[in-house]
Curated annotation (Swiss-Prot):
GO cellular component, one term: cytoplasm
Keywords from the UniProt entry: Aminoacyl-tRNA synthetase, ATP-binding, Cytoplasm, Ligase, Nucleotide-binding, Protein biosynthesis
Native species: Acetivibrio thermocellus (strain ATCC 27405 / DSM 1237 / JCM 9322 / NBRC 103400 / NCIMB 10682 / NRRL B-4536 / VPI 7372)
Keyword Transmembrane among UniProt keywords: no
Principal location listed in the UniProt entry: cytoplasm
Name of this protein: Histidine--tRNA ligase
Pfam families, sorted: HGTP_anticodon (PF03129), tRNA-synt_His (PF13393)
Gene from which the chain derives: hisS
Assigned protein family: Belongs to the class-II aminoacyl-tRNA synthetase family.
Gene Ontology MF terms in the entry: ATP binding; catalytic activity, acting on a protein; histidine-tRNA ligase activity; transferase activity
Biological processes, Gene Ontology terms: histidyl-tRNA aminoacylation
InterPro entries linked to this entry: aa-tRNA-synth_II, aa-tRNA-synth_II/BPL/LPL, Anticodon-bd, Anticodon-bd_dom_sf, His-tRNA-ligase, HisRS-like_core, HisRS/HisZ, HisRS_anticodon
Domain of life: Bacteria
EC number(s) recorded for this UniProt protein: 6.1.1.21
Catalyzed reactions per annotation: tRNA(His) + L-histidine + ATP = L-histidyl-tRNA(His) + AMP + diphosphate + H(+)
């Protein structure tokens, strides 16, 4: 067990990490283009933050959090998502005094004790954005368009946008009465978890993944059809904004998202390329969350996407990733004098911003050239006593095989051409 990664975790090896570098670079560019600034939050927070923020009736809080007592007997939890930590930081650091909206993004690892399956891990990578202070549907449209543009830039096809509105506390209270009246005759057929949710948070039953519960809720009254005027107008504004940008969408009355903090707009981007639970990105508005966590009433909206699932979609669709940069040159050296000269030359090349490699294992010249080929070096040079004495060597283009004698003094300028 000592030499095996814990269940639900995965090493990202050098042969794969270039794909992550590409996605991370595209994330940074996207967020820059939309005016979002990066925030870095702690890996762990006080457990109460997630109980209050995520919701103590959610699967995440009830079943999936990694929670422990620290040496001071404080209850600490590894972050299961990013929003609650960003909200805490927004409050603690007085960001309400900044020009609004405050637009933030993060690229983090998160931790949930989930059933491990393809694309779902217990340690996973999550990219998310949060925007605070804008109450109208325009920011909802911007957030959704941001995800759409990101997928377009990555070349992802066959991904659909589903939207819904789950209202505000006012219309949700009225809706909950209707939902409870509908569910009450079927309580015995609901799973044990949903039976506990019936009184505390009946809306959460709509989100249950158990087949028996899904059958019962399939014909339940839809919250989107029971909105108050304010929520209805907000949803109409969202739809009009998406249509104005030419973004296709479908209304899915069953989207409630798995977190209690959502209000009004909720949305998911779904792909058929990763199995039954094909959500790649999800998000929505949370107008009461900042206040619930101890701040002033502040509207907010955000999204999060799992990067493991994003990678699965890209690979399943055959999308090519730009390969990692190969060494500009490999310097092969034979003999102590040549090796010493090569060490200095490699250092000088690296100081100039060039990627240079040399043998560190005492291999033969033939083995060194084979190694240079495996590294994918663009050029190679072989050094021995004769080359050092003359100050000249043969520069070989490893792709074409073309060879040309050059002065060693001009090597840096030639490689920079």
């Amino acid at each position: 067990m000592l030499t095996q990664a814990p269940k639900g975790t995965k090493d990202i090896l050098p042969s794969e990490v270039y794909k992550w570098h590409y996605i991370e670079k595209e994330i940074a560019k996207l967020c820059h283009d939309f005016g979002y600034k990066e925030i870095r939050i702690p890996v762990f927070e006080h457990t109460e933050l997630f109980q209050r923020g995520v919701g103590d009736t959610t699967d995440i809080v009830q079943k999936e959090m990694y929670t422990f007592l620290d040496k001071g007997q404080r209850s600490i939890t590894l972050r299961p998502e990013g929003t609650a930590g960003v909200v805490r930081s927004y409050i603690e650091n007085g960001m309400a005094s900044l020009p609004q909206p405050v637009k933030l993004y993060y690229n983090i690892t998160a931790y949930r004790y989930e059933n491990v399956q393809k694309g779902r891990y217990r340690e996973f990578h999550q990219f998310g954005v949060e925007a605070f202070g804008a109450p109208g549907p325009s920011i909802d449209v911007e957030i959704i368009s941001m995800v759409k543009l990101f997928f377009d830039r990555l070349g992802i096809k066959e991904i659909s946008l589903n939207i819904n509105s789950i209202g505000c506390p006012v219309c949700r209270a009225e809706y909950n009465k209707k939902l409870m009246d509908y569910l009450r005759p079927n309580l015995s057929k609901l799973c044990a978890t949903c039976n506990t949710r019936f009184e505390r948070n009946p809306l959460r039953i709509i989100d249950c993944k158990e087949e028996s519960c899904k059958k019962i809720t399939a014909n339940a009254p839809a919250l989107v059809e029971n909105l108050c005027d304010d929520c209805k107008n907000h949803f109409e504004g969202l739809k009009a904004g998406l249509e104005n940008l030419g973004i296709d969408y479908k209304i899915d009355k069953n989207i409630v998202r798995g977190l209690d903090y959502y209000t009004k707009t909720v949305f998911e981007f779904v792909s058929d390329n990763i199995g039954a639970q094909g959500t790649v990105c999800g998000g929505g508005r949370y107008d009461g969350l900042v206040e619930a966590c101890g701040g002033k009433p502040t509207p907010g909206i955000g999204f999060a996407m799992g990067l493991e699932r994003l990678l699965m979609v890209m690979e399943n669709q055959g999308i090519k990733f730009p390969e990692s940069k190969k060494p500009d040159i490999f310097i092969a050296a034979i003999g102590d004098k040549a090796n010493s000269y090569a060490e200095k030359m490699v250092y000088e090349l690296r100081k100039e911003g060039l990627s240079a490699e040399k043998d560190l294992m005492g291999k033969s010249l033939k083995a060194q050239m084979k190694y240079a080929d495996k590294l994918g070096a663009k050029y190679s040079i072989a050094l021995g006593d004769d080359e050092i004495e003359s100050g000249k060597a043969v520069l070989k283009n490893m792709e074409t095989g073309e060879q040309k004698e050059i002065s060693l003094d001009t090597l840096i300028s030639r490689l920079k051409m």
